[in-house]
Structures are given as C-alpha cells and as structure tokens.
Amino acid sequence: MKLIVISDVHLKPGMFERASELMDEEKLDGAVCLMDLPDDWGHGKDFGLYIETYDAASRFAAAYPETKWCWGNHDLSYKWGLDQSGYSSAMQGTVRGLQGRMADLLPAGNPIRYAQRIGSVIFSHDGLSDLYVREAAPSIKGNDVDGVLDRVNSRGARYLWNDESPIWLRPQPQYHPTKLFHEKAMLQVVGHTPVDGIWRQGYLISCDVFSTYPDGTPIDTQEFLVLDTVTWDFDGVQ
C-alpha cells in the first residue's frame, strides 16, 4: 500500500489541499494524518484560520474516509483542557466544537487514535516505545500488535500526558534514544519533532518538516512523506 503522511499541520489548511492533489498525481492508496491541527506562532486568536484549517481537514476526511488520524499533543490539550506551549485559551471552546464536528464525519470503526497500524507500519504523533508498552500492556504478548494498540488507544490523559507516551516521546537519537516497540518487525512513522528533511534511522521515520520559525519562515523542506507500507521504501514529495 502506497500512502501519503500529513504531519503536524499547525493551522496550514493548504497542506490538505496539496495532499488531495497528490493522492491523484501519485496514484496513492491512502493517507495518514499525524494531526496537531491547531496552534501556530502568533495565531492564538485567529478564529478564521482555525475554522479554515478544520474545514480543510474535514473536507479531506470526507473525500478519503479511510484516512487514518492520530492525535497530537496540541489536539489533546484542547480535548483534555491541558495547557502547554502554543495553547490558546481563547480558542478552547471553538476547537472542541470543531473536533467534535470532525469526529462525526469519520466512519464508524475508524476514529482518531493515538496509534494506528497499516500492515507492518505503526503511525503515531511521536512514537511508541517498548518501555511504554510494557507499562501499558504488561499482560499482552509483544507480537500481538493489535492487542497492544487497542490497550494504548483505550488510555486517557493520566497515562498519555507524559514524556514517554506516543504523543510526547521524541525517540530520535539526538533527543530521547529508546528501544521502539516491536523493533525489526515494525517500522514506526512519527511527527512532532521538527527535522531537517524526512529521514529514516533504524526502524523510525521522522517527517515533521512543515514547521516554521516564529516569523513564519519554514524550518524544513515542507514535503510530504510518501511511503510503501510493504517494502518500507519512501520519498518526499512537495
């Protein structure tokens, strides 16, 4: 299966428009969004931009109903009412309403989750570590990947709002090198941490390349990860 990954949107509705074009241009089979739809530098009260971003995400969800969606920390700060850098209290009620509207568009059985699996690839906002799995699902055998993910996806803020969870981990070697869940058998794809171009190290692909500096200047390459979930071959496409 060849798919596109939309990572760390942060109020850039045009990402969904371009991803939709690439679905046709690249003849892709599906899409995954690692979310972080809200929040960007200096836009904490830009009501129109929040609406525009969620409208674009909702249109994409309606056009491609099999898309997999993964909660990011910025999404969950509104869902759970937890403050963090970039969070806008002025937009709390608006974002919660937009999240609910978008959730209603998704097919039954395909809700937004913390971690998603397609074949031998696990997608999450920021990585699923072996340590977190051993704490979250000690009675589930590691080769029962779906059982582990079901357990992780059933958890709430108490177990997710910490640095070891799949929304905060930063498993890149320069930040928090760690053993990933089911290494060698599973590839993991993450966003959250801005990187200088899409890259793979071991069994991890990092693809948050749309982040910007406070003045709006792009930090990274602003390209989409296109991944073959069978061969693990990948490319970046603008």
Where are these regions (language model features)?
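Beta-strand-turn-beta hairpins that frame and shape the catalytic cleft
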Residues: M1-I4, Q116-F123, Q201-Y203
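Short active-site oxyanion
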Residues: M1-L3, P65-K68, M186-L187
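Short hydrophobic beta-strand that contains or immediately precedes a catalytic carboxylate
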Residues: V5-I6, W71, F123-S124, V190, ...
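Core catalytic region of metal-dependent phosphoesterases/phosphodiesterases
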Residues: I6, L11-Q99
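Active-site environment of divalent metal-dependent phosphoester hydrolases
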Residues: H10-E17, D39-G42, H74-G81, Q116, ...
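Flexible, charged surface loops at secondary-structure boundaries
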Residues: D24-K27, A62-A63, R117, K179-K184, ...
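Active-site-proximal loop/helix segment associated with metal-binding centers of metalloenzymes
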Residues: A90-A108, I112-L180
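Conserved beta-sheet core of the metallophosphoesterase superfamily
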Residues: Q172-D235
